[in-house]
């Protein structure tokens, strides 16, 4: 890129390089695809199906239980204390509270299960649950992906 500097009237050459994001995008797409398969594994329904309660959605409803599938990729948010998480700075804890609130506001007592693919993510949430930092009303289940 060329541009005239008003200070010295000289032409400056600035090079601009576009970063190669294909590897990042490919890796993210692979995780998203695996998570869709994981959701289907956990819910036994097509990935595009959701079960809505108020303004929140669950991945499925099975045997009288609202089901959410927490696939791969959450460990990085735990390691950074949920900053920059798609779930907000409160992370999955805030997300869980929103889901519980929606069920309670609907006047329901339907149980909620979270199936968690990553063992480290499961362990973190389980420990938070034991210490009262994660809602005890949500049953946490470690379900490894097929």
Listing of model-derived features with the role each one plays in the protein:
Residues 1-146:
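Catalytic toxin/effector domains delivered as secreted proteins or via bacterial secretion systems
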């Amino acid at each position: 890129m060329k541009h005239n500097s008003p200070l010295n009237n000289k032409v400056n050459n600035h090079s601009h390089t576009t970063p190669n994001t294909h590897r990042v995008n490919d890796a993210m797409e692979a995780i998203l695809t695996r998570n869709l398969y994981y959701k289907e594994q956990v819910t036994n329904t097509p990935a595009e199906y959701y079960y809505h309660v108020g303004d929140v959605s669950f991945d499925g409803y099975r045997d009288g239980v609202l089901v959410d599938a927490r696939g791969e990729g959450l460990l990085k948010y735990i390691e950074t204390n949920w900053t920059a998480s798609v779930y907000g700075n409160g992370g999955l804890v805030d997300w869980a509270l929103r889901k519980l609130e929606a069920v309670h506001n609907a006047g329901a007592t339907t149980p909620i299960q979270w199936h968690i693919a990553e063992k480290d993510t499961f362990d973190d949430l389980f420990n938070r649950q034991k210490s009262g930092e994660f809602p005890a009303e949500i049953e946490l289940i470690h379900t490894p992906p097929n």
